[in-house]
Amino acid sequence: HAALISRLKIMAELDISEKRMPQDGRISLRIGGRAVDVRVSTLPSAHGERAVLRILDKGDANKFTLESLGMSGDSLSRFKRLLRQPHGIVLVTGPTGSGKTTTLYAGLSTVDAATTNVLTVEDPVEYELIGQTQVNAKIELTFAKALRAILRQDPDVIMIGEIRDFETAQIAVQASLTGHLVLATLHTNDAPSAVTRLTDMGIEPFLLSSSLLGVLGQRLVRKLCVHCKRQDGQGKWHPVGCTECGMSGYKGRTGVYELMVADDEIRGLIHAQAAEAKLFEIAQLNGMKTMREDGDRLVGEGVTSLEEVLRVTRE
C-alpha cells in the first residue's frame, strides 16, 4: 500500500516525504492516443495515507454539444436563448461531480469562436480551449485576481470555473453589467437557491436582479443498459444486469435539469429579496420543470429508472 501511494505521489509530483499533510496534484497521461488528466488527492489517516484519483478525459472541448446532454427540447431552446444574450450572467448549479463544467463547455461550443473572444478562469483547466487561465494558489493567483486580469483582455464571454467567495461573485456580476456574458458554476441544491447563495455572499439584490439571465440546476443519473433493461407490466423500465454493463444494469450517464429564467417577475422578486420558496413557486408557474419532473420524463422514455431519479433528486 505504501509503495503504491509513493508511486502515485511521484507521478503527481507531490512531496513523498510529507505524510502528515493533505496534498493535491495531477498526472497527465496518454492512453490509446487520448490525453487523460488524473487528479490526485492524498490524505493522512490512522493506517497510512489514502489517495483518491479523479479521471478527466482532456479532449477537445468542442466535442460537447448541448444536444448531447439529455435536456428536454423546451429547456434546451430556452438555455440556448440565454447564451445568445450579449451580456448578463448565466449560472449552472449542482453538487460536486454533477456535470456543471461539461454543461458550461457545451454552452461555449454554441459561441462563434471566430468572432467572439472567449476566456476562462478555472481550477484546474478541465478541457482544452484557447484562452484559458488556471488558478494557482501557490503563487496567489486567485479566481478574483485572474478575473481582474481577464477583464483587461477585451473578452466577450467569460467562463468562471466556480464562484467560491464574495470577491469573485462581485467581479462576475460587475463584468456581466458592463457588457460581458458571464458563465459560472455554483454549489447549491437547486436553481432558485443560487440567488440566495449569492445574496448571502454579499451581492446586492438590485445588482443581481439587473445582471442575472438564468440558473440551470442539474444532477447526473445513470442510464439503463440498452442490452438488458426490462419493462414491467405497467410499462416501467428496470435494470437487470449483463456482461455489457458489468452486471450493474446501468451504462453511461445523462443529466436531469431545471432551468429558472430570470424574467421580469423573477427579477422583481430578487430585487424585493423574496424568500427562496416564493422564487421556486413563481419559476414553476413561469414554466420551470423541476429536476424530479425532468427525471420522470427520462423514466417515461426508458432512459433511466425511477430509483435513479429518486436517488439524486428531492421533493
Question: Could you say what each language-model-derived stretch is?
Answer:
Residues 1-315:
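Short, flexible helix-loop junctions that flank or precede catalytic/ligand sites
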